[in-house]
């Protein structure tokens, strides 16, 4: 399971980004594998099972899927709990905002995973209005990359903007989560 998690956070993560229109350079890909190889090592995964590149990661994922059973009831419960977090989080003040976030996340799941997996995980299919969201995200990514990937300085600006956005999300979670909040 740890190998599958490792592969999910490296190979499958990058495939999802590409599906959302993000161009990943070979240097960035190498960096992601290096990061997750180190994390896998710290988690105790034997080094021989830690892929250094896409080819080896694909082989590992294929090997893992041949010995792993289909998703079970526990997998569906985990998916349900992850989606429920959208409704339980305290970042958004109003219920309708949290429901909107849930629908957007469901639409991304249906875009990134195939129909069989979504059904097996019992992820509700989003309403048609929400199914356009991943297409908007993809288009936005493609446009921003055309603007910011022209040269190194523009690329650095894009990286810095992304970093600031991530820090804002983290700050929002910290600011809006009550100190005594428990799931």
What are these regions (language model features)?
Residues 1-183:
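Mature, function-bearing regions of proteins
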């Amino acid at each position: 399971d740890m190998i599958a998690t490792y592969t999910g956070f490296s190979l499958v993560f990058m495939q999802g980004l590409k599906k959302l229109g993000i161009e990943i350079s070979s240097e960035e890909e190498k960096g992601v594998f290096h990061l997750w190889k180190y994390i896998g090592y710290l988690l105790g995964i034997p080094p021989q099972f830690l892929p250094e590149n896409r080819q080896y990661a694909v082989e590992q994922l294929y090997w893992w899927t041949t010995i792993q059973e289909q998703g079970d009831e526990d997998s569906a419960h985990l998916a349900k709990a992850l989606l429920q977090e959208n409704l339980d989080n305290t970042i958004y003040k109003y219920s309708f905002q949290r429901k909107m976030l849930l629908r957007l996340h469901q639409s991304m799941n249906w875009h990134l995973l195939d129909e069989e997996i979504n059904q097996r995980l019992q992820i509700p299919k989003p309403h048609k209005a929400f199914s356009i969201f991943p297409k908007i995200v993809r288009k936005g990514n493609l446009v921003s990359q055309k603007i910011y990937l022209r040269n190194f300085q523009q690329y650095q600006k894009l990286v810095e903007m992304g970093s600031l956005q991530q820090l804002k999300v983290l700050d929002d979670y910290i600011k809006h989560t009550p100190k005594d909040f428990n799931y």
